Amino acid sequence: MKILVAFAVIMLVSAQVLAAEIGLNDEPEWYSDQIQEDLPVFENFLQRIARKPSPDRFYGLMGKRNNGFGQMSRKRSAERNTIHNYERRRK
């Protein structure tokens, strides 16, 4: 049991020493941060608009496409197609 405690203490001490050596840099090294600082406010606004997808290209949860019908079973989908075809014939 003493060996396990000694091993745990050694691991914790080594983790603290290695974490202190690595440290955090205060300089911004991220590419996206540098781009955001360089762009004027108006171009930043236009860039956000360009990134925003239109509602017809919106992907819902789990990557499923949103086609406006929601989640339907095959039976309901077949019923909807039958009703749609019936209405088309009546016209």
From Swiss-Prot:
Residues found modified as Methionine amide: M62
Single GO BP term: tachykinin receptor signaling pathway
GO cellular component term of the entry, any: extracellular region
Record's signal peptide: 1-19
Biased composition (Basic and acidic residues): 76-91
Location of the region described as Disordered in the Swiss-Prot/TrEMBL record: 64-91
Residue stretch(es) of the prosequence: 20-51, 66-91
Family stated for the protein in its record: Belongs to the tachykinin family.
Protein name listed in UniProt: Tachykinin-like peptide
Natural source organism: Theloderma corticale
Lineage, broadest ranks: Eukaryota, Metazoa, Chordata, Craniata, Vertebrata
